[in-house]
Amino acid sequence: MKGALRGTPRVVRVAAAQMGPIQRTDSRESAVARLVALLHRAADQGAQLVVFPELALTTFFPRWFVDDIATADHYYETSMPSPATQPLFDAAKQRKVGFSLGYAELTADGHRFNTQVLVERDGAIVAKYRKVHIPGHASNEPNRPFQHAERYYFEPSDEGFGVWNAFGGRIGMMICNDRR
């Protein structure tokens, strides 16, 4: 495979899908319906890969601090795909369009990550990446009208920055503050 990639022009048409705000009261299903609509729109315009934002399934909940982190468990995914996100995977497979999806992940052993998956055009997950550089603060700052408590809600990944074979080439992922 190494030789086949070298010198071969690879062009992938990528769509950046901007969702707009998700309210705290919005359901996961309504967020996924918006993602599916954006995927179809991108596919209609010839996209092969749709990149969705960080934490695309929920409001950006680190803006609000809760004393008991377990009360925020409903923001986290424990499996991917899940019953709520399966329609997005099905649409990707049907339209033969891959995607990258950001979400909050709660592992079976209780770890919380800001995670991104890369999904190929057949609807299969080919890579999972967890945010390395977590910004913000880890405790409540009561004088702030909005928090930036990512360090409270997420732990940094120790897996580093990976690169995977996908979309006819090599592709990596990073999330927001990882760009530094």
Regions found by a protein language model. Name each.
Residues 1-2, 84, 159:
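Alpha-helical scaffolding within the catalytic cores
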Residues 3-14, 162-172:
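Beta-strand-turn-beta hairpins that frame and shape the catalytic cleft
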Residues 18-24:
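Short polar catalytic/cofactor-binding loops
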Residues 19, 55, 178-179:
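Active-site metal-binding loops of divalent metal-dependent hydrolases
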Residues 90, 107-180:
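Active-site catalytic loop in hydrolytic enzyme cores
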